[in-house]
Amino acid sequence: MAEAHQAVAFQFTVTPEGVDFRLSREALKHIYLSGINSWKKRLIRIKNGILRGVYPGSPTSWLVVASATAGSSYYNVDISMGLVNHIQRCLPERYGPYWTPQTRALLSMAVVSTGVWMIGIFFFRQTLKLLLSYHGWMFEMHGQSSRVTKVWAICVRLLSSRRPMLYSFQTSLPKLPVPSVPATIHRYLESVQHLLDDEEYSRKEMLAKEFQEKTAPRLQKYLVLKSWWATNYVSDWWEEYVYLRGRTPLMVNSNYYVMDLVLMRSTDVQAARLGNAVHAMIMYRRKLDREDIKPVMALGIVPMCSYQMERMFNTTRIPGKDTDTLQHLTDSRHVAVYHKGRFFKVWLYEGSRLLKPCELELQFQRILDDPSPPQPGEEKLAALTAGGRVEWAQARQAFFSSGKNKFALDAIERAAFFVALDEESHHYDPEDEASLSLYGKALLHGNCYNRWFDKSFTLIAFKNGQLGLNTEHAWADAPIIGHLWEFVLGTDTFHLGYTETGHCLGKPNPMLAPPQRLQWDIPEQCQAVIESSYQVAKALADDVELYCFQFLPFGKGLIKKCRTSPDAFVQIALQLAYFRDRGKFCLTYEASMTRMFREGRTETVRSCTRESTAFVQAMVEGRRVKADLQDLFRKAAQKHQNMYRLAMTGAGIDRHLFCLYVVSKYLGVSSPFLAEVLSEPWRLSTSQIAQFQIRMFDPNKYPNHLGAGGGFGPVADDGYGVSYMIAGENTIFFHVSSKFSSSETNAQRFGNHIRQALLDLADLFQVPKTDS
């Protein structure tokens, strides 16, 4: 492996003859090329900033306006209504030899044209923002758009017809509206009434009424005031108080995982698969830097906010005693790699050239072939990121703030992302039900010290070439990393490819400098902290029960025949499964996005509704005829869809109450109602996994090019975490988590209840399905 001094531009030694300087020509070359590359990126950002700033206008549209102004002047038609002549009179008559009347006239026309052009841009942008504030289309039946919606769609298409860059729509997106307090209180009480007995509900209703009349008006005024000047009245507080101020371990509690393709694998060569994946990720980062990614669009015309994508790469969560911070760099030219207890730094570029996949394969193979042992304290070092945040912050300050430890830690924290080369093999074997769950467990927590849980994401490569991600949650939500992952898997399969022997295509440069081994000096006191963090993390990991399975009888295709939303279908099945599992209902959390608003993140859909509980109880009792059950099911599905739409359009419950609670804390106002609401446990936390955000291939033509989604740990100690991906027309993947320490939960038992609930719903509509 490369010595540490290879990364240093110059060294000096003191001799009897004086100071002897030794320059490294190669290192200076890297510094020079890095500077050139940095300036290129700055120029690209400036150019993109200008193009983004004038959207939906363009430089071409300015030329059209300028040409029209000049042409009208040529034909003695003053379309400026005297403004050109007025500006011309205001300009000095003498200002050098080239300052002729013609120059003054051209300058005046340019000023007027630019002003008219910018006024037009402002008008079109505000019009587009107004149009994007219309959400009536979401509440209409599919295929039955009203005349208003059709006209609206035409107008949006006209105003956004020019090919947008990634952030072109950011300033045209509307702000997240603040709901009225009475509406939020009404929806909240409606969401819990069927879960409480009459006495408890009356008490809750009195608390809510007291809050609405006495405390809420003052809090609401401050919240509305914030919404006027802040880009988004929720997102900054959500990031800080829900994520960054959390003091419990990130592993299991916050981070989530994403799986690879599970029905196919292009190669079994670990270094080759990783070489293609890393190359594809840096290709994506380059497109991200250049804003050369099309924004995600609902219906193909409604843009989603792209703000969260900014911190995908070069980002690390830095621990603090009271609160963490997110450190984001504009660029990083290396990745940090962990293998067999050692840390390495792998450069992604040779000069200004991105390494080819085969060259990255060479670098990773060099690490795999390196026989050197870990240094004292190095093997389990990453357990610090898996344990308590306060302990990690104190250790970081005490042992990693100077010297070689700081240098090595900087190499990890300033990396584009983290890479873990695992010694285990994992894959999905349909004949072995446990294989998918073991794969998920490896991604969720590994052995508690082979993932750097603070990085924006860790790319994991198993010995057999299977990949996966472990993702930190504070910087963005799951659809963002999903967008990257779809690009990586599509690029790996359909663009980069492999040789017949499973290696990356092309020939590497054998003279590439080898990866740099990071050097540590970890004292025994620090090693004791590392071991303590490891024990905390191991106890947490050992307590997680994860059950992942592929539901084969049907997928989206059959659900559509039931004439209902696939998400509503699954959510009602989850309610039926939970009631059969626990004999009662509970508050249920489903994550919905608010990305139709600027800097929007998520909102909660309280999917255990009065309508869904009525249907479940009727199903369990078994006394109703099918027609009645179908009617109850459709009412429950319609209610769920309506709540989901309300959440997406800014009329949710929980983010509003959360922000009112934050305001109350700032003002020192006590609110028993808010304190009680925010302490209610979510014993069933669910999330649907987004897919096909990028159309890189036809899924019908390549049915095996299918990922299994991802999952997360349980939110409540006696609850379940459930994520699911409706993977095409014929299958659904589920990831169910719980804790062994709870006598009330069992992930596999609940998974079996989910299976049966789905089959029972299909039988209710008598839709043919395949064998399990």
UniProtKB/Swiss-Prot annotation:
The chain crosses the membrane at residues 48-73, 103-122. It comes from the Eukaryota. The keyword NADP does not apply. GO terms for cellular component: mitochondrial outer membrane; mitochondrion. The keyword Lipid metabolism applies. Residues 1-47, 123-772 are cytoplasmic. PROSITE patterns: ACYLTRANSF_C_1, ACYLTRANSF_C_2. Residues 74-102 are mitochondrial intermembrane. One of its GO terms (molecular function) is carnitine O-palmitoyltransferase activity. InterPro entries: Carn_acyl_trans, CAT-like_dom_sf, Cho/carn_acyl_trans, Cho/carn_acyl_trans_2, CPT_N. Its EC number is 2.3.1.21. It is a multi-pass membrane protein. This is Carnitine O-palmitoyltransferase 1, muscle isoform. It catalyses: (R)-carnitine + hexadecanoyl-CoA = O-hexadecanoyl-(R)-carnitine + CoA. (R)-carnitine binds at Y589, T602. GO terms for biological process: carnitine metabolic process; fatty acid beta-oxidation; fatty acid metabolic process; long-chain fatty acid transport; response to blue light.
